[in-house]
């Protein structure tokens, strides 16, 4: 993957809000590479409450299109995607001339093994699915951000558990059923997806 842009969204000459204790991710753009609508909705709510903008890619091809256009502040990459492994994208981003500042992997299956494999591929950290609380989401991102991108002073730890829209879960289940109805359903992908 070649990234021909060396700028992050925060390099643009517009006004960029600074992080605050209440909105510690304000001013950041998070690229969520996630095929599950339910998990994407959860990430959207976490970003919204944290002050971050979110862009979504539901597959590797879409993620590559995003990365050719801009460099996000943070990338959250699901390891099991319909058109390949998120590990390959993590490796590509890790080798890029202008690396995304924070790359986190996410998976709901075999968490310890997935985390170890993702870190070996070059991820900075790992977010298990589902993310337990708003504080856990914010803390994992802030832990890996460069000092100059973090909010100054103490910040409240919000233990709020955000509930994504149940309609998104129904859509994910309908998608899985449709895949099972194929002549040759992609069982490996379905195991990771569900």
What residues fall within each predicted segment?
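Non-catalytic signal-transmission and effector/linker regions of two-component phosphorelay proteins
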Residues: 1-31, 35, 154-160
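Conserved acidic segment of CheY-like receiver
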Residues: 25-38, 43-47, 75
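Short hydrophobic/Thr-rich beta-strand motif most characteristic of the beta2 strand and flanking loop
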Residues: 51-59, 66
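Acidic catalytic/metal-coordinating carboxylates
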Residues: 59, 85-88
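Active-site beta3 strand of CheY-like receiver
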Residues: 70-81
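Short amphipathic alpha-helix used as the core "switch/output" element in two-component signaling
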Residues: 87-99
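Alpha4 helix (beta4-alpha4-beta5 surface) of REC/receiver domains from two-component response regulators
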Residues: 88, 109-127, 135-139, 143
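C-terminal output/effector regions of signal-responsive regulators
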Residues: 154-194
């Amino acid at each position: 993957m070649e990234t021909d842009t060396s700028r992050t969204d925060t390099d643009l000459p517009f006004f960029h809000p600074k992080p605050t204790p209440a909105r510690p991710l304000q001013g950041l753009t998070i690229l969520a590479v996630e095929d599950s609508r339910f998990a994407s909705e959860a990430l959207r709510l976490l970003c919204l409450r944290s002050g971050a903008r979110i862009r979504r890619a539901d597959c590797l091809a879409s993620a590559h299109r995003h990365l050719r256009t801009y460099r996000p502040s943070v990338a959250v990459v699901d390891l099991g995607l319909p058109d390949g492994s998120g590990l390959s994208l993590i490796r590509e981003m890790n080798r890029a001339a202008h690396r995304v500042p924070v790359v986190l992997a996410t998976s709901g299956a075999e968490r310890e093994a997935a985390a170890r494999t993702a870190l070996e591929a070059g991820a900075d950290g790992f977010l298990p699915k589902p993310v337990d609380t708003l504080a856990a989401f914010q803390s994992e991102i802030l832990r890996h951000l460069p000092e100059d991108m973090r909010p100054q002073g103490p910040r409240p730890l919000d233990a709020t558990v955000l509930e994504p829209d149940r309609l998104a879960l129904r859509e994910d289940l309908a998608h899985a059923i449709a895949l099972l109805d194929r002549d040759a359903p992609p069982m490996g992908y379905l195991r990771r997806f569900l």
